[in-house]
Amino acid sequence: MPTRSPSVVISDDEPGYDLDLFCIPNHYAEDLEKVFIPHGLIMDRTERLARDVMKEMGGHHIVALCVLKGGYKFFADLLDYIKALNRNSDRSIPMTVDFIRLKSYCNDQSTGDIKVIGGDDLSTLTGKNVLIVEDIIDTGKTMQTLLSLVKQYSPKMVKVASLLVKRTSRSVGYRPDFVGFEIPDKFVVGYALDYNEYFRDLNHVCVISETGKAKYKA
């Protein structure tokens, strides 16, 4: 039986990197505490995840389902690596994409009230290998809701790839099949992860400062 792939574990006392060591947009200079995961490390890890995905799912038509909005950069980069592997494989397979949007956050807390936006026509998932691509797993409740929805369409296989998984006491115990980084319970932004729609334009994953939280609070 396939096992979940290992992840890069970032410890609770990880100091991160000084903002001055990286190119950070000036409009966010006072809003961030530190760079937590540099963009280059994200890309290297994503390349390896693509290999793991193809090894486990590459025998049948894959439908890659992007969870918007936070997942779009990870989704695009992961698919670029998967497509490169697929092009150079002797047993290449067709791959299609679809999109769904979930809403469960206000400010820095998951509300528990999960809204599914889109996904009205997911009948194309029937009989396919479905790869759900998410930016971050916090409590796991949001993903459990989405998995319940997807499984109603009888896919051949469903796997989840998430760039980040938080270690938090609020977790329901859900763990994705493919994980980039396991991180402490900090609110992170950047690489399309947002705080009330801000910070998506950062290349790196960063820890937001209290100043930033207050400035962009809903």
Curated annotation (Swiss-Prot):
The keyword Glycosyltransferase applies. Binds 2 magnesium ions per subunit. The magnesium ions are essentially bound to the substrate and have few direct interactions with the protein. PROSITE patterns: PUR_PYR_PR_TRANSFER. There is a cross-link at K115 (Glycyl lysine isopeptide (Lys-Gly) (interchain with G-Cter in SUMO1)). GO terms for molecular function: guanine phosphoribosyltransferase activity; hypoxanthine phosphoribosyltransferase activity; identical protein binding; magnesium ion binding; nucleotide binding. GMP binds at residues 69, 134-142, 166, 186-188, 194. It is found in: Cytoplasm. Its cofactor is Mg(2+). Its main location: cytoplasm. The modification N6-acetyllysine is found at K103. It catalyses: IMP + diphosphate = hypoxanthine + 5-phospho-alpha-D-ribose 1-diphosphate; GMP + diphosphate = guanine + 5-phospho-alpha-D-ribose 1-diphosphate. Keywords: Acetylation, Cytoplasm, Glycosyltransferase, Isopeptide bond, Magnesium, Metal-binding, Nucleotide-binding, Phosphoprotein, Purine salvage, Transferase, Ubl conjugation. One of its GO terms (biological process) is positive regulation of dopamine metabolic process. Pathway: Purine metabolism; IMP biosynthesis via salvage pathway; IMP from hypoxanthine: step 1/1. The active site is at D138 (proton acceptor). The modification Phosphothreonine is found at T142. GO terms for cellular component: cytoplasm; cytosol. Mg(2+) binds at D194. InterPro entries: HGPRT, Hxn_phspho_trans, PRibTrfase_dom, PRTase-like. Its EC number is 2.4.2.8. It is an enzyme of class 2 (transferase). Converts guanine to guanosine monophosphate, and hypoxanthine to inosine monophosphate. Transfers the 5-phosphoribosyl group from 5-phosphoribosylpyrophosphate onto the purine. Plays a central role in the generation of purine nucleotides through the purine salvage pathway. Homotetramer. Belongs to the purine/pyrimidine phosphoribosyltransferase family. This is Hypoxanthine-guanine phosphoribosyltransferase. It comes from Mus musculus (Mouse). The lineage of its organism: Eukaryota, Metazoa, Chordata, Craniata, Vertebrata.
